[in-house]
Amino acid sequence: MLVFLAAIAGKFCVAQELAYDAIYNFITKEYTLSKDGNVDYHYSSSLKLLTHQAFQRYFGESFIVYNPEFQKLKINKSRTIMADGKKVDSPHNAFNEVLPGFASGSVAYNHLREMVVSHTGLEVGATIEFDYNLMSQAKGMPYLMGEEILSFPVPVESCKIIVKVPEGTILNYKMLNLRLSPEITTAKGMMIYTWNFGKVEANPHEIYMPEASSYFPFLTFSTSPSLQRSLELFTNQPAFTDTRLPQTAVARIEQIKRSNSSDSKKIIQIRNLVINELSYLQIPSATIAFKFRTPAEVWESLSGTEIEKTILLAALLRQAGYQADIVASVPTHVLDTKWFNPLDINAYYVRTEIPEIASIYLSAIYEHPYNLLPNLYGNTLLLVDPAAESEKKWEIYPENSTIKVKGSFDIKSFSVEGKAELEATGRYHPFYRILENDKEINRILTGL
């Protein structure tokens, strides 16, 4: 009986392995904050390849994006242990620096680098051992921050996250979707926080999944001070304080102001100008140390990151005479109001006012026909303003949108004629299109 059960268990383990292209033996991520403010990120993993597809499509290369201006990359190990036990180290020409795809076409960010590591000696049954350090100087936000989502394309047998800070330094952290507290120890003047997740299942390969932080184990941590102080540090840079615009930008705004268009149409024209005439650079803020360019620099370069285009949009709207506030969106369940991790920001918007009509939210990176506020349900918005004397935040709650039609109609064989009054409440309507063109109401009525 014992032999029979052992055979079943063995077959089950083999079947479970073959359900995936590979399996991580372990993944360890370690963050170390030194007393001088520098941060060392140490990554180490061991990956067993189970299919040809594993190394032909998915795991044949590793990619590390970094910024040479304040970061130094050191690869400690890139080795393959073949199925017969032979060890093959990656040769010198297996390490190649390229420009990250998201920095393509940008002069301002063409110093960014992506290290492409080509693993060699790959075959079914081989194991890739990979280990590197990424050391960051104290530039930008003057504290440690990190964000880890326990989401992997294949299973992980052992996953561990370690954070080390000098004794006396407070590490703020929040764990979501999993009840797991860190093991806290001290050694050599450092406080060591260890989250041992053990075995982690592969993420489901399905479409229409919710945001990862809403159901995967999610860890966010930071040595930041209070939320207010963090926002002060965030906005203490010329990008937020030097809002001067080039003459070419001022001329474009004056041209829009002189038109006979309504205020709503002028606002949308300015928004579309930023969206359509400036390229969108999907560069993570952490990669540029949360240091952004001024509106003038962004305008003249014809490109910008999400936050840079948002800052520019706010500056252009103010130039046109409209109120404009920059806000950052953070998932409410992630935000802890006692401290702040800028990595938790998921989007930036401009809040402006259509005179005598409504307060609206605009994106600087994609067009939308309605007020974005309903889309922000489940998020808390933070005012990003260097002149703010205290933190300003507000949570977005769900809001019903309704359409009420009252009138008299003459129903004929192939048409309906009559007069009616339409009342649309809430914000989930093609708000901007209605203000620009009354006939947009006909399209709404057609769908009722």
Annotated model-derived regions:
Residues F63-E97, P155-N172, I434-L448:
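Solvent-exposed beta-hairpin/edge-strand motifs
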Residues S45, A126-I128, I161, I270, ...:
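Cysteine-centered nucleophilic/redox motifs
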